[in-house]
Amino acid sequence: MFLTVKQKILIILLEKGPLQNSEIARRAGITEQWCSETINALYADGLIESQFITPRRINKLTGRGLEIAKRLKEISENVISKSVRHV
């Protein structure tokens, strides 16, 4: 299963908890600029909330974001599990 960058970030925040943009970018394998743009989109979608502690931006899942991230992780793990069994 291929995840979009948005989906990948949601799962990263689910697994690791609140993180700075730079750490999310590193874990997702994307640039900090791309990460910032994606974080803004996730914020606009109501899936994450950000706390600004100068000069840092700490991001965490909202309740809705948590529900979606859990479901995405479950689906991706099921797909991977089924793929491995068929090899």
Q: What do these predicted ranges mean?
A:
Residues 29-44:
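Short amphipathic alpha-helical interaction segments
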Residues 2-3, 32, 54:
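Alpha-helix N-cap/helix-initiation sites
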Residues 19-27:
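Short acidic, hydrophobic short linear motifs in intrinsically disordered regions
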Residues 2-18:
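Short amphipathic alpha-helical interface segments
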Residues 52-58:
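Short, Lys/Arg-rich nucleic-acid/phosphate-binding segment
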Residues 19, 59-61:
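A broad, structural micro-motif
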Residues 66-87:
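Amphipathic alpha-helical dimerization/coiled-coil segments
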